[in-house]
Amino acid sequence: MLVVDSSVWIDFFNDADHPSVELLDQLLAHGEVRIVVPDLVLFEVLRGFRLESELRQARRLLESLSIEPAGGEELALAAVQHYRSLRAQGFTVRSGIDVLVAAYCIENDYALLHRDRDFD
């Protein structure tokens, strides 16, 4: 299973020319990999649309995939541990949501497609 981070979805909906967007296009066209959309990613992606028509179109596509809840106490505590470990190693994570998404992928053994240096 694969989680696609908001960094890729945003580029996808903006028709950006990038290998991660091309890969997502192929995955959506062929349906060979189950794409999971954590609710946190759903929020990050949909909050950026200005036009209602674009929001509806994006929502339809994302809701056609597997939307899963990504919150809860257990995940939050796992994310705290990951965050603290990264800080102890000298890494600064810019987004708390990115830590939650990463913890969600780790806890569920999901791959992550991203364009965000927080995940590197």
What feature does the model see in each segment?
Residues W9-I10, L42, F119:
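A generic structural signal for short hydrophobic patches within well-formed alpha-helices
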